[in-house]
């Protein structure tokens, strides 16, 4: 392997030993594809780790299954971001999903993922239920009809560059508007250690917009601090805390990280310093 490939954040480096296979700049960001000794091929955007073949389930399972196992219906799903295909792949494991809109702003992320990381997207790209749109997910949410989706998932990068607008009130209000009754919204919500201020602000804002929102904590070892979060929100009570057993039974055996038991523990694993900051 050629050397160390590092992500730098606030005076700390997070690195993998490996080789750079592709490095290019799209109209939106710098994209790198690497081959690492530890986690296989991986993707970086603007120098930040996004995903890798042997790590992606830590992230994708945590984002998808608490939402799809708890929403009242899951026929129509919107995924904003997620150009590697991993989030859509986990969603399409549910036969109840009839239509999934995958809206990714950077077409090169999709193309490079299909070429170099085909195992992450799997059969998504040929599944007739998945409609890929290369475009702005923020504009998509703003223009979508009221109550048009059962589940809305935001699989974006950190709050900078093209993903910055995925973290503000106007966007979250549109996500609430397009969610059907009984629906669930979910988003990656940064690290409570490496991005503490952003994380706390996101959870507070989602509670204001939706009425009910709670973070779930897990680990993604290649991300800053290794400790990550996903926040789930709903209008009609914290339904994301109640797993539907029949749906869970369909997917649990194929999961490496998620299970109903893991989900319960991860939702309850709020550290004291975060609980104090989130207290009314």
Swiss-Prot record:
Protein name: Polyamine aminopropyltransferase
Swiss-Prot/TrEMBL GO biological process terms: spermidine biosynthetic process
Recorded family membership: Belongs to the spermidine/spermine synthase family.
Domain called PABS: residue spans: 2-235
Catalyzed reactions: S-adenosyl 3-(methylsulfanyl)propylamine + putrescine = S-methyl-5'-thioadenosine + spermidine + H(+)
Pfam families: Spermine_synt_N, Spermine_synth
PROSITE patterns: PABS_1 (PS01330), PABS_2 (PS51006)
CDD domains: AdoMet_MTases
Keyword annotations of the record: Cytoplasm, Polyamine biosynthesis, Spermidine biosynthesis, Transferase
Primary role: Catalyzes the irreversible transfer of a propylamine group from the amino donor S-adenosylmethioninamine (decarboxy-AdoMet) to putrescine (1,4-diaminobutane) to yield spermidine.
Residues at which S-methyl-5'-thioadenosine binds: 29, 104, 136-137, 162
Active site, UniProt feature: 155 (proton acceptor)
Binding positions (spermidine): 60, 84
HAMAP family: Spermidine_synth
MF terms in GO: spermidine synthase activity
Binding partners and assembly: Homodimer or homotetramer.
Cellular localization per UniProt: Cytoplasm
């Amino acid at each position: 392997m050629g050397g160390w490939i590092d992500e730098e954040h606030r005076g700390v480096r997070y690195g993998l030993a490996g080789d750079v296979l592709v490095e290019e700049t799209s109209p939106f960001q710098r994209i790198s594809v690497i081959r690492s000794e530890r986690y296989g091929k991986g993707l970086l955007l603007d120098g930040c780790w996004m995903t890798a073949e042997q790590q992606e389930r830590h992230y994708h399972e945590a984002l998808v299954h608490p939402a799809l196992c708890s929403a009242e219906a899951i026929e129509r799903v919107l995924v904003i971001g997620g150009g590697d295909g991993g989030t859509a792949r986990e969603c399409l494991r549910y036969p109840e999903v009839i239509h999934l809109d995958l809206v990714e702003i950077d077409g090169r992320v999709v193309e490079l993922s299909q070429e170099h990381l085909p195992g992450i997207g799997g059969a998504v790209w040929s599944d007739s239920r998945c409609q890929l749109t290369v475009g702005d997910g923020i504009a998509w949410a703003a223009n979508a009809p009221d109550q048009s989706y059962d589940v809305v998932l935001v699989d974006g990068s950190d709050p900078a560059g093209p993903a910055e607008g995925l973290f503000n009130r106007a966007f979250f209000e549109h996500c609430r508007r397009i969610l059907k009754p009984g629906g669930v919204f979910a988003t990656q919500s940064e690290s409570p250690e490496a991005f503490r201020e952003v994380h706390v602000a996101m959870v507070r804002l989602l509670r204001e917009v939706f009425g009910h929102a709670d973070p779930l904590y897990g680990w993604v070892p290649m991300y800053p601090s290794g400790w990550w979060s996903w926040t789930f929100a709903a209008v009609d009570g914290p339904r994301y805390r109640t797993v539907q057993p029949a749906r869970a039974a369909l997917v649990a055996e194929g999961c490496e990280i998620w299970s109903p038991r893991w989900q319960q523990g991860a939702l309850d694993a709020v550290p004291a310093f975060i609980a104090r900051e989130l207290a009314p």
